[in-house]
Amino acid sequence: MILKDSLEAKSCFKSSQTSHLAARVAMENPQKGNVINAQSSRQPSSENEFRENLFFKEMRTNGKNEHETSCRSVVLYRNSKSAKRYPLSTKCARISYMQGNKDTKTALTKKYKSNEDVSRMRKKGNKYPQCKSKNLYDSLKLEECIESWSLNQKQNENFYEHTHLNSRDDSNPSSCDRETFFLSDEDSEISLMEGLSSIENGYPDEKETLAALDNVKLSDENAAHLGYLVKYFQNYTDKIILKETLMDWEDKEPSLQELTESTKYLENLADTDHRTSNKPFLFLR
């Protein structure tokens, strides 16, 4: 599916301060090969392809403009054989991607405003959509649920991105209109659609609820907290954000204000990977 060049996916960079950091991490050219990038020969799983096709099919069917959907920005993998585009909501700073080591993946705990904890269970080798209903997980094979189930992306008032699995049959007791679910990737590679979790709620930290950063002010306290999140992310993923991704690409490390407020800075950085002379991503606005 190829979108026309005239596509304008309205971006929310300026209203989501941590989205800049998320996009930088997404652009990182990993040495371990655990993130799908322009040089990767692996293709996204069939589940993700199904999600993408359904997303754009729904967009066309409903006659919605791009800026009226949950797709706030579109990421294009250059040199991809299928020239796929992936919705990436910049309202939700999705940077805590998992290491693709084919080991059992840690459940991510998401904190709802109602103080309801929901875990995203990522199990080794699990290729089925999972739906939580009355503490039971109903696994459905993809090919069996295409006709009877639909996937929708929605956002709640906290700007946490939710993925809902809704049944077209109202009498189906396993209909999930509040619970999140995921589609795992066979190769434990990351999908920008599903694998990138929110910086504000994506870490498996049971001792502390990480604060949402939509309202971060550039105070010393909040700057220190953002630094803590970055350090936590680096320890968790074994990847360096500032040293590896930014300082090697630029003459100087950007200030926190540049990091969180400058859309132009982000787009310039996104345009070219200065270490490889590649242009791995194209951000459409």
From Swiss-Prot:
Taxonomic superkingdom: Eukaryota
Localisation per UniProt entry: Cytoplasm; Nucleus
One annotated GO biological process: meiotic cell cycle
Chief localisation class: cytoplasm
Keywords tagged on the record: Cytoplasm, Meiosis, Nucleus
Annotated GO CC locations: cytoplasm; cytosol; nucleus
Function statement: Has a role in meiosis.
Identification of the protein by name: Meiotically up-regulated gene 125 protein
Source organism of the structure: Schizosaccharomyces pombe (strain 972 / ATCC 24843)
Gene: mug125
